[in-house]
């Protein structure tokens, strides 16, 4: 959430804010700033963050940027809202050289909420207390890493019983599985972390590796219903099924699922059926598959032109029979799987003005989702929202008429956004990765 820094001050959600000071009559009424649409910033103006729009906001840097990450479910409990928060991320870097890459475990803790501005009547003693409080409120980051040859395109984490593992797509064309238990242990204790980085990290190797894709890829998803079952898709249009075997290994079916004609961009297992999954592709299609059929005949449903161009990302709702997709056309589309044969989405939203890079349904609220785009925006949406005809916002600023009613919030300030995830155990908490680093935030809207 940002506002113009200058004589006018507006917030990104389209709610005009009072001018800070000065005579604005010569400028006419305040205008809402719509990211990617204007009005353009004038000389001397810049966007500044409106901290009152955030319950919590933190940023983190890891050196080389991360193209992908996943949130690691922990044993700290569900529905955590009490601050400060603790969370764990597994991420992979995109470094300048292949040998400089790392698979990382991040422990972020002491994450406090945004601090209210000081009152006008605060005295010197209160200011000293605030300084002490500020020191205690500093966020903390522990980072354990292991060498990885090649940039990491995608990371997805799953628990195999009590064992956390990460599936890792490498730009070198391999898909690897890494055990994460040791990394989770050492980020809890500074001395253990120092010993690990000194003596152990170079020896950590994947517990399984598959090089049968004949090229790199990005699509990867663990089944939420069948422990250890994995799908991987590559830029050569092939999708392979991984089946866990006794002894902690996998059998990878060498027969690819046949249907797409270009790169497979994303994969999502059904949250309700063990054998069904969805895929999207640079061929503009979305397909629904059933692994009980032979790979050459497993495609059951197809929407051939789901977007005008590449379909980059999909997310299958855990609570409703809805599939969410985002494409190079900047559109977000909702597909009712009960009507998928019709080939038409039940809703289309066009807020992003560049390719959509990530989408995800809220894990607890069935109508809420988030998306990120190459236009440096993260948007939050709620399908249940309808504009109040008596509110008068549109009359106050006609620019609001173009905003979708379901748009809750627009977050900016990141550069080259790549991926976002809701925290499954901390309601409303979003984490994103971009060239500018990680951002952890919760807005007043969700």
From Swiss-Prot:
Residues recorded with modification Phosphoserine: 119, 122, 344
Compartments, record wording: Nucleus, Nucleolus; Nucleus; Chromosome
Pfam families: CAF1C_H4-bd, WD40
Keywords: Chromosome, DNA replication, Nucleus, Phosphoprotein, Repeat, WD repeat
Induction pattern: Induced by E2F transcription factors.
GO molecular function annotations of the record: chromatin binding; DNA replication origin binding; histone binding; RNA binding
Chain intervals with Acidic residues compositional bias: 121-135
InterPro entries, per the entry: G-protein_beta_WD-40_rep, Glutamate-rich_WD_repeat, Histone-bd_RBBP4-like_N, WD40/YVTN_repeat-like_dom_sf, WD40_repeat_CS, WD40_repeat_dom_sf, WD40_rpt
Positions bearing Phosphothreonine: 10
GO cellular component, one term: chromosome
SUPFAM superfamilies, A to Z: WD40 repeat-like
Quaternary context: Interacts with METTL18. Interacts with CDT1; origin binding of GRWD1 is dependent on CDT1. Interacts with CDC6; origin binding of GRWD1 is dependent on CDC6. Binds to histone H2A-H2B and H3-H4 complexes.
Functional note: Histone binding-protein that regulates chromatin dynamics and minichromosome maintenance (MCM) loading at replication origins, possibly by promoting chromatin openness.
Family matches, as PANTHER family: GLUTAMATE-RICH WD REPEAT-CONTAINING PROTEIN 1 (PTHR45903:SF1)
Protein name: Glutamate-rich WD repeat-containing protein 1
Species per Swiss-Prot/TrEMBL record: Homo sapiens (Human)
Encoding gene, per UniProt annotation: GRWD1
């Amino acid at each position: 959430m940002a506002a113009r820094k200058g004589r006018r001050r507006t917030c990104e959600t389209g709610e005009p804010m009072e001018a800070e000071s000065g005579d604005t009559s010569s400028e006419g009424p305040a205008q809402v700033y719509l990211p990617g649409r204007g009005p353009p910033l004038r000389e001397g103006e810049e966007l500044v963050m409106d901290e009152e729009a955030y319950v919590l906001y933190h940023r983190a840097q890891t050196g080389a940027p991360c193209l992908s990450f996943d949130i690691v479910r922990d044993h700290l409990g569900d529905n955590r809202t009490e601050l400060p928060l603790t969370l764990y991320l597994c991420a992979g870097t995109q470094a300048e050289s292949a040998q400089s890459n790392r698979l990382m475990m991040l422990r972020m803790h002491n994450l406090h909420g945004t601090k209210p501005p000081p009152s006008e009547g605060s005295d010197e003693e209160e200011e000293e207390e605030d300084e002490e409080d500020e020191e205690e409120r500093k966020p903390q980051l522990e980072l354990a890493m292991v060498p990885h040859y090649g940039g990491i395109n995608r990371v997805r984490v799953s628990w195999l019983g009590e064992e956390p593992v990460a599936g890792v797509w490498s730009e070198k064309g391999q898909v690897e599985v890494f055990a994460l238990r040791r990394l989770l242990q050492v980020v809890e204790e500074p001395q253990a972390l120092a010993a690990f980085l000194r003596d152990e990290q170079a020896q950590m190797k994947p517990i399984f590796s598959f090089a049968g894709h004949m090229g790199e890829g990005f699509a990867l998803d663990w089944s939420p219903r069948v422990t250890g079952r994995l799908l991987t898709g590559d830029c050569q249009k092939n999708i392979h099924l991984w089946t866990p075997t006794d002894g902690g290994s996998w059998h990878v079916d060498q027969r690819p699922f046949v249907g797409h004609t270009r790169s497979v961009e994303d994969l999502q297992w059904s949250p309700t059926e063990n054998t069904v999954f969805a895929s999207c592709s640079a061929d503009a299609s979305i397909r629904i598959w059933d692994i009980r059929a032979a790979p050459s005949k497993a495609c059951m449903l197809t929407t051939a032109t789901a977007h005008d161009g590449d379909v980059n990302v999909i997310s299958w709702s855990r609570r409703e029979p809805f599939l969410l997709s985002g494409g190079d056309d900047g559109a977000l589309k909702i597909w009712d799987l009960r009507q998928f044969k019709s080939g038409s989405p039940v809703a289309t939203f066009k807020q992003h003005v560049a390719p959509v890079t990530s989408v995800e349904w809220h894990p607890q609220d069935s109508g809420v989702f988030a998306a990120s785009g190459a236009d440096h925006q993260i948007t939050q949406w709620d399908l249940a929202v309808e504009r109040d005809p008596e509110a008068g916002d549109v009359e106050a600023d006609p620019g609001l008429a173009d905003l979708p009613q379901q748009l809750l919030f627009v977050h900016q300030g990141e550069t080259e956004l790549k991926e976002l995830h809701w925290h499954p155990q901390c309601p409303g908490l979003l984490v994103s990765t971009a060239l500018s680093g990680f951002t952890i935030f919760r807005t007043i809207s969700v």
